[in-house]
A protein has these predicted regions:
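Carbohydrate-active catalytic/glycan-binding domains of CAZyme proteins
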Residues: 1-544
Length: 544
């Protein structure tokens, strides 16, 4: 059986509301103050594995491309992005994904020298049973293989390689009209790129009574099999529960202290805690990554999306995991880490578009149209070629964005764009989805070149500010400044004198009001209804 508290982890929990995203190290010790989230912004549904001294982590990505960001850490707290598991259209067709479609939760595992990432494209059925598939590689920075589709229903698939070579795929499915955890075994042929199901899918566990059992993970620890899942929905009732048995098939002995993690009904900065995954460090200590939200305001809404967090795990005398101190996730706590801190070089806040390809932070909305984006047409600039789709159309606009990662953020872009006709438009948008966004843009209205701020809230769209421009041939700097309560929009022609022209309340871009499973992006975009639209050129984009 597992030894209780194998790493001697000590906790000093705190619910301080600092905006720190990493930690401070105490002198002469590995005890550090860790501030959750460890990966801020819309990076939900984390899954983790370890290879030697290195940790790798994957998250879901929904309708954004490339999909499934892959992160690397050597201390569990400082993470750098290596790339994406799904960076080709052949791996990730998103034509019919829509808002919060596309890629749901992944599981990332390492087995016999190879990484496996298994997930669901809920908008694409690659097998008779739906959109579950896996990709694999020997290098987590890529490239990853083409999808191997799995004939098993549901979402949130887990892949487990047992000691006898059996490969178990466990997912959240439906049986007899109920959501429950289901499972089958597969034979993988990586050379042929096929996976053959060996048996009918069987019901595995209904959970403990919370709605929507999902996010299953199976572990073999000291000869005991543990099945850990999420329940309660991914909102404030979210929780992690666990059971164990002598086989990956059960029968299951349910933990008497379930849920082992939940902040439900607690006055804590972090909410919706759940969807956990376990990893053991070289010193035999155990850790869990999970998602959480940071709601604000009287209505307790969040705009940053579900974010990746960390907590230590100890094992009690009965062999059950204890997450954190009492199954709660703190925003800030002092923990003894299994490694010395290993920070990565700071990424530049500004992208000058001087490289021959975009960095890992950038995402397209759905699959991009290749001819709509160019880094070589005007060297040192990113050129966007407009499409006729509006931001509210629900289709594929020319759109390129980065996640909002903090409450207080300033995002600025320099735009060179001369609109010719009504409908020609380019600018900077704070984006939740097609129905909820705020943008500042250069366009033409009533025959005059203007700067506008538009608010789209559900089916209501309104230009709330309009400033006539005397010389649209000159580049303009566009800025969005954020706080917990508002997005504020400003412009400048020289970078020194700024004019704020409008604002919008943050809550209308929140997941509770306007979204489903994603967080806010800041994106540059270009629109036009003309047959030969003028190009939109961006010299740089900066997020601080």
């Amino acid at each position: 059986m597992i030894s209780p508290n194998p790493a001697g982890i000590t906790l000093d929990t705190s619910d301080g509301r600092s905006n720190g995203l990493h930690m401070r190290q105490d002198s002469g010790s590995r005890a550090v103050v860790v501030c959750n989230p460890v990966i801020p912004g819309f990076y939900p549904d984390p899954s983790i594995c370890r290879v030697g001294e290195d940790y790798y982590l994957a998250t879901s990505s929904f309708e954004y491309f490339p999909g499934v960001p892959i992160f690397h850490s050597r201390d569990l707290v400082h993470w750098r992005q290596l790339g994406h598991a799904l960076d080709r259209r052949s791996q990730l067709p998103l034509d019919e994904s829509g808002t919060s479609g596309g890629i749901y939760a992944p599981t990332l595992r390492y087995h016999q020298g190879r990484f496996y990432m298994i997930t669901t494209n809920v908008s694409h059925h690659g097998s008779p049973s739906g959109g579950n598939f896996l990709v694999h590689t020997t290098d987590p920075s890529g490239p990853w293989s083409e999808p191997i589709w799995l004939d098993q229903e549901g979402i949130d698939p887990d892949i487990f390689f047992d000691h006898d070579g059996t490969v178990y795929v466990t997912s959240s499915g439906r049986s007899d009209g109920r959501c429950r955890i289901v499972q089958s075994t597969f034979t993988l042929d990586l050379e042929r790129g096929v996976a053959e199901r060996n048996e009918p899918v069987v019901d595995l566990w209904d959970g403990t009574g919370g709605r929507g059992p999902e996010a299953p993970h199976i572990y073999s620890i000291d000869g005991v099999y543990y099945l850990m899942i999420a329940e309660g929905g991914t909102e404030d009732g979210h929780m992690v529960t666990i059971a164990r048995g002598s086989s990956p098939r059960g029968p299951w002995d349910v933990c008497p202290r379930n849920p082992i993690l939940s902040n439900r009904s607690l006055d804590r900065p972090l909410q919706a805690t759940g969807h956990g995954d376990l990893v053991q460090s070289p010193d035999r200590s155990w850790w869990m990554v999970m998602l959480a939200t940071r709601p604000t305001g009287y209505h307790r809404v969040h705009v940053l999306g579900r974010e990746t967090c960390l907590a230590p795990v100890r094992w009690d005398t009965e062999g059950w995991p204890v997450v954190g101190k009492h199954g709660e996730l703190p925003h800030e706590a002092t923990w003894r880490l299994p490694h010395r801190l290993q920070r990565w070089p700071e990424e530049p806040a500004r992208d000058d578009f001087d490289a021959d390809q975009l960095g890992h932070k950038w995402n397209h909305l759905y699959n991009p149209i290749p001819d709509a984006y160019s880094l070589v047409e005007r060297p040192g600039w990113l050129t966007l070629h407009a499409r006729s789709e509006s931001l509210a159309s629900g289709s594929r606009p020319t759109w390129l964005g980065q996640r909002q990662t903090a409450f207080d953020q300033v995002v600025t872009a320099l735009l060179d764009f001369e609109p010719q006709d009504e409908g020609d438009e380019a600018g900077l948008v704070a984006w939740q989805n097609h129905e909820h966004h705020y943008e500042i843009a250069r366009t033409v209205r009533s025959g005059n070149p203007v700067l506008i701020v538009r608010r789209q809230i559900g089916s209501l769209s309104a230009v709330v500010s309009e400033i006539e421009e005397t010389d649209p041939s000159k580049p303009v700097q566009l800025r969005v400044s954020t706080s917990k309560t508002h997005y504020r929009f400003a412009y400048s022609h020289d970078g020194d004198a700024w004019a704020e022209i409008a604002s919008g309340e943050s809550r209308y871009l929140s997941s509770e009001v306007g979204g489903l499973f994603t967080g806010v992006y800041f994106a540059i975009y270009s629109l036009s209804g003309s047959k030969e639209p003028p190009p939109s050129r961006f010299d740089w984009f900066e997020a601080t």
